[in-house]
């Protein structure tokens, strides 16, 4: 599944921001707008036993240009919350359910 970082209208959002995938399915997060964004999974809102640092970008790493991507495959079933570190305060958050 492809998830856009930044709405086509310039909004600070993940599109889609709530979705489901199969276990092991690849998520491609793609910068849509050319603003600096990243993808960080919330260590308190992922299945227990999953290491957030292994599935997240470093909070200081950014996808700066439109078209840049970050890919991750989630192998444990459950619900994962994620956010864009620079824009979390603006509501740039999302959730994925792994079946």
Swiss-Prot record:
Primary localization: plastid
Lineage, broadest ranks: Eukaryota, Viridiplantae, Streptophyta, Embryophyta, Tracheophyta
Signal sequence region: none
SUPFAM superfamilies: Cupredoxins (SSF49503)
Membrane topology: Peripheral membrane protein
A GO molecular-function descriptor: copper ion binding
Taxonomy, superkingdom: Eukaryota
Alphabetical list of Pfam families matching this protein: Copper-bind
CDD domains from the UniProt entry: Plastocyanin
Keywords from the named record: Chloroplast, Copper, Electron transport, Membrane, Metal-binding, Plastid, Thylakoid, Transport
Domain Plastocyanin-like residues, every copy: 1-99
The protein's required cofactors: Cu(2+)
Family classification: Belongs to the plastocyanin family.
InterPro entries membership: BlueCu_1, BlueCu_1_BS, Copper_blue_Plastocyanin, Cupredoxin, Plastocyanin
Purpose: Participates in electron transfer between P700 and the cytochrome b6-f complex in photosystem I.
NCBIfam families (alphabetical): cyanin_plasto
Gene: PETE
Cellular component terms (Gene Ontology): chloroplast thylakoid lumen; chloroplast thylakoid membrane
Protein localization: Plastid, Chloroplast thylakoid membrane
Positions contributing to Cu cation binding: 37, 84, 87, 92
Protein name (database record): Plastocyanin
